[in-house]
């Protein structure tokens, strides 16, 4: 059976998790996909078993001697880990700071997209830090960055307050905005209502309502899109230098 389609490079954005052929040690302790301890075996043999089931061989404890690996669906594993992280985040009710990067040359279309993203983050109860990075002679025209940040403030002032006004630090101009108290109250009420419904279901012996991950998924999607755009901007800037 051919190796599963998962591309190991997908794991590189987070902690380095070794899977499949990236597990280089000759011998490992293996846990089956059903949780059964299969004992110590040669890595190539464990990989063969994973392939036969159409699954991945994933290193779950690299510090053990020998390292512990588990046969599982890595795509599902990553999804479950994200879900656990979201759950922990909900319980902590921590206000995150989302960063949005700009350039003096950011065009109107991209500026509007990034402002909409900021509006979404602020509406979800997060603070937003805007950074405008200057390259080369761009630093001689800081007024362009100031205009961009003023435009952003104007379009977000309905739901957010300026926490730190635009300021220059070396070759970067920054602005920090925070959700207005009414927005934070609305977010807190929604979380409290969801938790109350969950606790009530548990007390009545019913299955707890599934958590609605739509908002978290939208936020994550926006962050990925912003990251991709930042990479494109960096490539373009390096090409023109």
Swiss-Prot record:
Question: What is the protein name for this chain?
Answer: Translation initiation factor IF-3
Segments of this protein annotated with the region Disordered? 193-241
- This protein's record includes keyword Protein biosynthesis: yes
Q: What is its main location?
A: cytoplasm
Q: Which InterPro entries match?
A: T_IF-3_C_sf, T_IF-3_N_sf, Translation_initiation_fac3_CS, Translation_initiation_fac_3, Translation_initiation_fac_3_C, Translation_initiation_fac_3_N
Gene encoding the protein: infC
Q: Describe the protein's quaternary organization and the partners it interacts with.
A: Monomer.
Where found, per UniProt? Cytoplasm
Q: What does the function comment of this entry state?
A: IF-3 binds to the 30S ribosomal subunit and shifts the equilibrium between 70S ribosomes and their 50S and 30S subunits in favor of the free subunits, thus enhancing the availability of 30S subunits on which protein synthesis initiation begins.
Q: Which GO terms describe its molecular function?
A: ribosome binding; translation initiation factor activity
Taxonomic classification? Bacteria, Pseudomonadati, Myxococcota, Polyangia, Polyangiales
Q: What Gene Ontology cellular component terms go with this record?
A: cytosol; membrane
Classification via NCBIfam families: infC
